[in-house]
């Protein structure tokens, strides 16, 4: 695994709008704060590969936490309690990973996510064709709103153990690929929201003239039954959504090739 570095010691000029933290948690620097003129203070963790020097374009992964990872729960608790950010290192050693600690799962946090993503695209050497987003639980709700506000910024979105809150029309226009993974009987959300979202996305893409093969590249619904959770000794289908970070087929989809 590629080790992280303390970004405060880098030779890369630090953006004036960011106050970098000094605490290292699982390879991520905390508590960084982007001071946005429009969206306020945005707290986040940051992983920078040791070999990043700003000369070569790198991928960017933004991982949105569930309720237990929000900022009021404590600095860095998102990276302590969820593995999406730490596991992502295994899939691309040339990728910056941003782990926002937002204040809720609603519109303000979605706007902050977009602002943070745009900031990294504008101030770091990021490949715009390799910008990935995931959201677990409440973070999935936030991510679905991000897909309403600025889907064109992202290469693919992994939506885990959540429900869909965003308007689908901008997503259809942008054709950003979406993978929705959840338990058939998720104890918090159920699965009706993602089922209905999947059906509506398929319908809208067909109306747009896309073939079923094309649609299958843009929308994936992955419903896990209780047997899947039992095999992994996971009792609760909602809480067990953290384990999707350890499923290679799911993570390979996110970081794979998307036309």
Regions found by a protein language model. Give the residues of each.
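A domain-start/cap signature at the N-terminus of enzymes
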Residues: 1-58, 141, 209-216
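C-terminal catalytic histidine-bearing segment of alpha/beta-hydrolase fold enzymes
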Residues: 168, 179-181, 185-189, 195, ...
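Solvent-exposed loop/turn segments at secondary-structure junctions
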Residues: 66-70, 102-107, 137-141, 162-166, ...
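Short, solvent-exposed loop/turn and secondary-structure capping segments
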Residues: 56-58, 71-77, 109-111, 145-146, ...
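Short, proline-enriched alpha-helix->beta-strand connector loops that line the catalytic pocket
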Residues: 93, 172-178
């Amino acid at each position: 695994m590629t080790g992280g570095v303390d970004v405060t010691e880098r030779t890369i000029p630090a953006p004036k709008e960011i106050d970098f933290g000094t605490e290292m948690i699982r390879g991520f620097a905390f508590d960084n704060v982007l001071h946005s003129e429009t969206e306020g203070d945005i707290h986040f963790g940051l992983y920078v590969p040791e070999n990043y020097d700003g000369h070569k374009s790198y991928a960017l992964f933004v991982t949105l936490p569930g309720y237990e990872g929000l900022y009021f729960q404590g600095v860095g608790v998102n990276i302590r309690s969820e593995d999406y950010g730490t596991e992502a290192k295994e899939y691309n050693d040339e990728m910056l990973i941003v782990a926002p600690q937002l204040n809720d799962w609603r519109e303000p946090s979605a706007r902050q996510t977009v602002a943070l993503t745009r900031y990294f695209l504008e101030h770091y050497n990021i490949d715009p064709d390799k910008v990935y987003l995931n959201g677990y639980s409440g973070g999935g709700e936030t991510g679905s709103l991000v897909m309403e506000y600025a889907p064109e910024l992202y290469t693919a979105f992994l939506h885990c153990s959540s429900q869909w809150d965003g308007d689908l029309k901008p997503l259809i226009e942008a054709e950003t690929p979406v993978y929705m993974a959840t338990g058939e009987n998720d104890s918090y959300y159920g699965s009706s929201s993602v089922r209905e979202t999947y059906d509506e996305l398929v319908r809208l893409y067909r109306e747009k003239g896309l073939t079923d093969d094309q649609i299958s590249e843009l929308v994936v619904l992955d419903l896990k039954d209780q047997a899947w959770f039992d095999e992994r000794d996971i009792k609760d289908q909602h809480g067990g959504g953290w384990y999707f970070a350890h499923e290679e087929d799911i993570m390979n989809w996110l970081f794979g090739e998307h036309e």
